[in-house]
């Protein structure tokens, strides 16, 4: 893993002014970024969201998933606290890529759930890798976090990278009639920590 920090810039948003920090991975040719707000230094745990790219949810406002709602909720939560970071990883479709995600959606249209669709295409249920986070966390000076997540794999990944998780903050939002089956599959087959009747 060859992660290199590139540059930072201001990013005005509907939730206030963030700093955007660019990183490149020479092994995968992917570009990742961190959105940060406030001073991340010190011993106090930093409010953090690990968010994998979802073009359909983040940019096209798809209701098939909860990704866009989760991203916006994380930005809002950080703006209220005045301090935090979102690690935005270019791992579209739980790591299978955009076109394969469309293929998976096609299978879901025919009745497969999100896990069955991935497996029918020859992929694992979740192909994401989080190893790039270690140098990104080091660059940002973050070693202790309050992690906004429902996904136990992210918790395990950060612990494995030596990140101290002071607290897990449930991050349920965006449930609607179009994604309720998807969310139940994430809870039942992927072990996500969901209540099942969140808003």
Curated annotation (Swiss-Prot):
GO terms for molecular function: GTP binding; GTP cyclohydrolase II activity; zinc ion binding. InterPro entries: GTP_cyclohydro_II, RibA, RibA-like_sf. Disulfide bonds: none annotated. The keyword Electron transport does not apply. Zn(2+) binds at residues 54, 65, 67. It catalyses: GTP + 4 H2O = 2,5-diamino-6-hydroxy-4-(5-phosphoribosylamino)-pyrimidine + formate + 2 phosphate + 3 H(+). GO terms for cellular component: cytosol. Binds 1 zinc ion per subunit. Pathway: Cofactor biosynthesis; riboflavin biosynthesis; 5-amino-6-(D-ribitylamino)uracil from GTP: step 1/4. The active site is at residues 126, 128. Keywords: GTP-binding, Hydrolase, Metal-binding, Nucleotide-binding, Riboflavin biosynthesis, Zinc. It comes from the Bacteria. Gene3D superfamilies: GTP cyclohydrolase II. Its cofactor is Zn(2+). Catalyzes the conversion of GTP to 2,5-diamino-6-ribosylamino-4(3H)-pyrimidinone 5'-phosphate (DARP), formate and pyrophosphate. PANTHER family: 3,4-DIHYDROXY-2-BUTANONE 4-PHOSPHATE SYNTHASE, GTP CYCLOHYDROLASE II-RELATED. Belongs to the GTP cyclohydrolase II family. This is GTP cyclohydrolase-2. It comes from Teredinibacter turnerae (strain ATCC 39867 / T7901).
């Amino acid at each position: 893993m060859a992660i290199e920090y590139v540059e930072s810039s201001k990013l005005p948003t509907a939730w206030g002014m963030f700093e955007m920090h660019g990183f490149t991975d020479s092994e995968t040719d992917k570009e990742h970024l961190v959105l940060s707000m406030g001073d991340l230094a010190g011993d106090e745990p930093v409010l953090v969201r690990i968010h994998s790219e979802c073009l359909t949810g983040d940019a096209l406002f798809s209701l098939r998933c909860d990704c866009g709602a989760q991203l916006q909720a994380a930005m809002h939560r950080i703006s209220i606290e005045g301090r935090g970071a979102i690690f935005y990883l270019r791992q579209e479709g739980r790591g299978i890529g955009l076109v394969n995600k469309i293929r998976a959606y096609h299978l879901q249209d025919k009745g497969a759930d999100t896990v069955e669709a991935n497996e029918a295409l020859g992929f694992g249920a979740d192909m994401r890798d989080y190893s790039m986070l270690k140098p990104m966390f080091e660059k940002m000076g973050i070693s202790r976090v309050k992690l906004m997540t429902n996904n136990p794999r992210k918790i395990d990944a950060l612990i494995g990278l030596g990140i101290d998780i002071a607290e897990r903050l449930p991050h349920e939002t965006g449930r609607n009639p179009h994604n309720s089956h998807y969310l139940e599959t994430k809870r039942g087959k992927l072990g996500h920590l969901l209540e099942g009747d969140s808003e």
